[in-house]
Amino acid sequence: MGLPWYRVHTVVLNDPGRLLSVHIMHTALVSGWAGSMALYELAVFDPSDPVLDPMWRQGMFVIPFMTRLGITNSWGGWNITGGTITNPGLWSYEGVAAAHIVFSGLCFLAAIWHWVYWDLEIFCDERTGKPSLDLPKIFGIHLFLSGVACFGFGAFHVTGLYGPGIWVSDPYGLTGKVQPVNPAWGVEGFDPFVPGGIASHHIAAGTLGILAGLFHLSVRPPQRLYKGLRMGNIETVLSSSIAAVFFAAFVVAGTMWYGSATTPIELFGPTRYQWDQGYFQQEIYRRVSAGLAENQSVSEAWSKIPEKLAFYDYIGNNPAKGGLFRAGSMDNGDGIAVGWLGHPVFRNKEGRELFVRRMPTFFETFPVVLVDGDGIVRADVPFRRAESKYSVEQVGVTVEFYGGELNGVSYSDPATVKKYARRAQLGEIFELDRATLKSDGVFRSSPRGWFTFGHASFALLFFFGHIWHGSRTLFRDVFAGIDPDLDAQVEFGAFQKLGDPTTKRQAV
């Protein structure tokens, strides 16, 4: 046929049977990728430490999405929260992966069948005897069916009426588990961090989809609208479908990057804004202050801080710290976290408590500056020692650890104090194993960052695709060179060739 690569899809333009076939094959590829990727991730995933080596540190991409929807058990006998199980049931991680692969195979066979048997009676217009599709009717059918699926997900799966519920956690990502969720019908349902909004919005959107689908099945579009929007042209369907996809991609890029109830930090890692705003640091200090108010010692108060909470307050878990072309998981960057060393408290020789100024997200290096409670600089690690006034040696800074592995240990040796001051720039201090994976010490992004980058990039690409195909279908007669002053009404789009003698003509 000699078509250039960018025009090969024209072969299914007027061939409804094979148009269906290639879409079924596309579904087979998507489902097959999802199932295969899940099996690969399960082969390399280490479930032994859900606190310091969770799925997002290991670079898992599809496991978090399965977990979000209620899958927590493995046929390997482990649970995502760290426990062991004896009866994982059919819908384990492996069960879902297998179901996708089986479904992919069935779609593959169906695609071949529809490619071979393309000339079906159902695609034949009985008035003309030519293949055609009633696109407004198909739109109504798809809208109705997607509405049913959307309503069913919100009303049954999410609420636990028939299904497991979804992953729900506290604001600090400590107590997450799969549980049923009641729909939130009040104004709180519009809070992106309220899980009940997921149920209520799916129920509402599904109901709207069902009603809209029934409307489009029972009401034909007016002739002027049908012709104006080129509703008889399959490229109109392509254009509007691309619009729906790029809009959804932009939305989920936002909910992933900025965080929401649909992207829990236990499954995808914290957001960069939680580091920027000192979100976890504030909660840690609040808990310590509450402990001190209950007459606990400083050591006791810090020892009660969950290791999981302390680990979130570490810059290496910030998805914006990874470079754009740094492949690999977070564990391949700064290493596998082994344990929390504790919270370092720095003091000068007068006994004044000092705080290390933390590194902002987009810095690779940052000066080590220690300030007092009023924000006044009291110590630093100088760049030029000859001019220094606030060096650790001159000010006599010491460090003492509370909580963690070094609880109660103090250091006054300047070299050691400076070492921990540098590490305190990065948040809470953890022991990291860089040997096991030959980690290079350069920060990587989490799946939150990859998902956002991928979906934002493809959304932009698909936006241009929508403009391109929308323009082609709306201005097809202009591009084809039809004279706008033509005094014959040409039903353009029903036939592919200009000058086709069978094209109906009607005097204007």
Curated annotation (Swiss-Prot):
Annotated keywords: Chlorophyll, Chloroplast, Chromophore, Membrane, Photosynthesis, Photosystem II, Plastid, Thylakoid, Transmembrane, Transmembrane helix
Annotated compartments: Plastid, Chloroplast thylakoid membrane
Any one GO MF term held by the record is: electron transporter, transferring electrons within the cyclic electron transport pathway of photosynthesis activity
Keyword Chloroplast in record: yes
InterPro entries, sorted: PS_antenna-like, PS_II_antenna-like_sf, PSII_PsbB
* Details of cofactor binding: Binds multiple chlorophylls. PSII binds additional chlorophylls, carotenoids and specific lipids.
Specify the domain of life of the species encoding this protein: Eukaryota
A Pfam cross-reference name: PSII
Q: Its membrane topology, per UniProt?
A: Multi-pass membrane protein
Tell me, what is an example of a GO biological process annotation in this record?
photosynthetic electron transport in photosystem II
Q: Where are the transmembrane segments?
A: 21-36, 101-115, 140-156, 203-218, 237-252, 457-472
Show the GO cellular component annotation of the record.
chloroplast thylakoid membrane; photosystem II
Function of the protein:
One of the components of the core complex of photosystem II (PSII). It binds chlorophyll and helps catalyze the primary light-induced photochemical processes of PSII. PSII is a light-driven water:plastoquinone oxidoreductase, using light energy to abstract electrons from H(2)O, generating O(2) and a proton gradient subsequently used for ATP formation.
- PANTHER family listed in its UniProt record: PHOTOSYSTEM II CP43 REACTION CENTER PROTEIN, PHOTOSYSTEM II CP47 REACTION CENTER PROTEIN
What family is it from? Belongs to the PsbB/PsbC family. PsbB subfamily.
Subunit structure, interactors included = PSII is composed of 1 copy each of membrane proteins PsbA, PsbB, PsbC, PsbD, PsbE, PsbF, PsbH, PsbI, PsbJ, PsbK, PsbL, PsbM, PsbT, PsbX, PsbY, PsbZ, Psb30/Ycf12, at least 3 peripheral proteins of the oxygen-evolving complex and a large number of cofactors. It forms dimeric complexes.
What is the protein named? Photosystem II CP47 reaction center protein
The coding gene here is psbB
